[in-house]
Amino acid sequence: MQLAIVLVAAGASTRMGFDKVWADLDGEPLLARAVASARSLQPAELILVVSAERLADAARLAPEATIVSGGPRRRDSVAAGLAASRAAWLAIHDGARALAPPELFQRGLDAAQPTGAAVPGIPLKDTIKRVAASRVVGTPVRAEHVAVQTPQVFRRDLLLRALAMTDDDVTDEAILVERLGIEVAVFVGDERAFKITTPLDFALAGAVLSDSRHVR
């Protein structure tokens, strides 16, 4: 079964104030840890989507990978990664979710088989409110919702159709696949797959790595 893992790492990192996926985390770039996790799922193809100025850095980091330049929007970067592969299945993964365990990729591929699409989800810890004009207008039932992570796994033809259907930019590819009327399966995510988008997240990632060394 052909699988390509597309690591999306071309974002502007505006919340961090610096290019987070290339920042040092315990002695190596954050992106290197995402690459190491993806490498463990063999014989999957690895595609790195990075900003134009980081193409050479990415080639040194993962010489076995296909390196492509991303676009100004997330959907543009995903489309660039998709165009670089002919694999039947694509796992779209945020480079900033660098501590996602390798087993998430296989879990996602297995979960996607019935419908062609699957996303990892974890239970919400906080109460969620719908807000308009700084006023609460509703409270969804927390048990009916999950926080969605990556890797998100799709059959190639579905993802191609979803991207071709609209030029809208979205926060994840599952939104576009849902608009096709396709049922998206949800599999069990992992708290370690959190997205590192703030300095506090970066500090937490360092603590997770330190704790994992002590456990071993």
Where are these regions (language model features)?
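Short beta-strand-to-loop acidic/aromatic patch adjacent to the donor-nucleotide binding site
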Residues: 87-97
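Conserved N-terminal catalytic core of the sugar/cofactor nucleotidyltransferase
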Residues: 31-88, 166
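SAM-dependent methyltransferases
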Residues: 1-4, 172-174, 191, 199-216
